[in-house]
C-alpha cells in the first residue's frame, strides 16, 4: 500500500501585487511599518526590474517540479505538496495546519536555499516544527544541498558556458565572484554558524570542478540594521579585485539564491553592473537554477538520502 508523506517546500515569499508590498515589508521588519520613503524605495526597485518580482511564480514551479520528480522516483511513497512562506501567505504555519487537516502524519521539509544557517533555514524549520508539534506530525528537515553533485554540476556547466564567451587568452584576467545573502555577523559568530563555511566550500568545489582560474567569495543584499553583516560586500569586492588584480571579466554566481528575484535582478544585474561599468570591466551573470532538472535533482537526491 502506498504511503502518503507531506512535502513542505518553504521559501521567503514575495508580494503578489502592489498592495501586498507594505504588509510584506512590515512582516520582514517584525511588525514595524516602513516609512513612506522606505516603501517607495522598494516599489522603485520592483519597478526597475520590470514589476513585481517573478519569485512567486518561480517558487510555485520549483515546488511542483520537485513534487513531480520525487514521485517519479518513489513506488511505495506518494508525496503531497504544501507550500509554506516566511513573510506572506500561505505562511509556514498555515501549510502545516493544512497538512493536519488532510490527515498527514509525516512530512519532509525543504527550504529553497542551498546553504544552512540557523538564521535562515533553521528559523524556517523551527516554525514548521513548533506547529507540527501541536498536531503530532513527524517532520524530517533537509538542512542543505549545496554539496550535492547535481547542484555543483549545474553551476559548473553555467560557469564553463560563460567562460566560452571570453577569449581563452583572457581567462587569466577573469574572476568568478561566488556570493550568498549576507547575514548579521554577530549572530553567525555567536551560534558558530556553518553558513560562511558552506559558501566557502561551494566556492572551493566550483574552482576545482570548473575551468575558472580565479575565484573570490562575497556577500550581498545585507539589511540596514546598523550592525555589522558578513562581508565583503560584492560591490566593494569588485572594486578591490579590480584595483589589486586588474581583472577584465567578472562572472557573478549568487549561489545562495535559487532563482531570478529582486536580490539577483537588482543587486547583481543593476548594482554590480553599475560598478563594472564604472571601472570599465565586463559583467556576466549566468542563469539561475529555477526549475532546471539538475537543480531539482539535487534536492531530490538529498531528500532520498534522508527517507
From Swiss-Prot:
Gene Ontology CC annotations of this record: cytoplasm
Localisation per UniProt entry: Cytoplasm
Metabolic or biological pathway, per its Swiss-Prot or TrEMBL entry: Porphyrin-containing compound metabolism; protoheme biosynthesis
GO terms for biological process, alphabetical: heme biosynthetic process
Amino-acid positions noted as binding Fe-coproporphyrin III in the UniProt annotation, renumbered to this chain: 12, 29, 45-46, 53, 124
A GO MF term: metal ion binding
UniProt family annotation: Belongs to the ferrochelatase family.
Name used for this protein in its record: Coproporphyrin III ferrochelatase
Organism: Staphylococcus epidermidis (strain ATCC 35984 / DSM 28319 / BCRC 17069 / CCUG 31568 / BM 3577 / RP62A)
Source taxonomy: Bacteria, Bacillati, Bacillota, Bacilli, Bacillales
Amino acid at each position: 500500500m502506498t504511503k502518503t508523506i507531506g512535502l513542505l517546500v518553504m521559501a521567503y515569499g514575495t508580494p503578489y501585487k502592489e498592495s501586498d508590498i507594505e504588509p510584506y515589508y512590515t512582516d520582514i521588519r517584525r511588525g514595524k511599518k516602513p516609512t513612506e520613503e522606505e516603501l517607495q524605495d522598494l516599489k522603485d526597485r520592483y519597478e526597475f526590474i520590470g514589476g513585481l518580482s517573478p519569485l512567486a511564480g518561480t517558487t510555485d514551479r520549483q515546488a511542483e517540479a520537485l513534487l513531480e520528480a520525487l514521485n517519479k522516483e518513489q513506488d511505495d511513497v506518494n508525496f503531497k505538496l504544501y507550500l509554506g512562506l516566511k513573510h506572506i501567505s500561505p505562511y509556514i504555519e498555515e501549510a502545516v495546519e493544512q497538512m493536519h487537516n488532510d490527515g498527514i502524519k509525516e512530512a519532509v521539509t525543504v527550504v529553497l536555499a542551498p546553504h544552512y544557517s540557523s538564521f535562515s533555514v533553521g528559523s524556517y524549520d523551527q516554525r514548521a516544527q513548533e506547529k507540527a508539534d501541536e498536531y503530532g506530525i513527524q517532520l524530517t528537515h533537509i538542512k542543505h544541498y549545496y554539496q550535492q553533485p547535481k547542484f555543483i554540476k549545474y553551476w559548473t556547466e553555467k560557469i564553463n558556458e560563460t567562460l566560452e564567451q571570453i577569449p581563452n587568452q583572457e581567462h587569466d584576467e577573469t574572476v568568478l565572484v561566488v556570493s550568498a545573502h549576507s547575514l548579521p555577523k554577530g549572530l553567525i559568530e555567536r551560534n558558530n554558524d556553518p553558513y560562511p563555511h558552506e559558501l566557502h566550500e561551494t566556492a572551493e568545489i566550483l574552482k576545482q570542478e570548473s575551468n575558472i582560474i580565479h575565484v573570490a567569495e562575497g556577500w550581498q543584499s545585507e539589511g540596514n540594521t546598523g550592525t555589522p553583516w558578513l562581508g565583503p560586500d560584492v560591490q566593494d569586492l569588485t572594486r578591490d579585485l579590480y584595483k589589486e588584480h586588474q581583472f577584465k571579466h567578472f562572472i557573478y554566481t549568487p549561489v545562495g539564491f535559487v532563482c531570478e528575484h529582486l536580490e539577483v535582478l537588482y543587486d547583481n544585474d543593476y548594482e554590480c553592473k553599475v560598478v563594472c561599468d564604472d571601472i570599465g570591466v565586463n559583467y556576466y551573470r549566468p542563469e539561475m537554477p529555477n526549475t532546471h532538472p539538475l537543480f531539482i535533482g539535487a534536492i531530490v537526491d538529498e531528500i532520498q538520502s534522508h527517507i
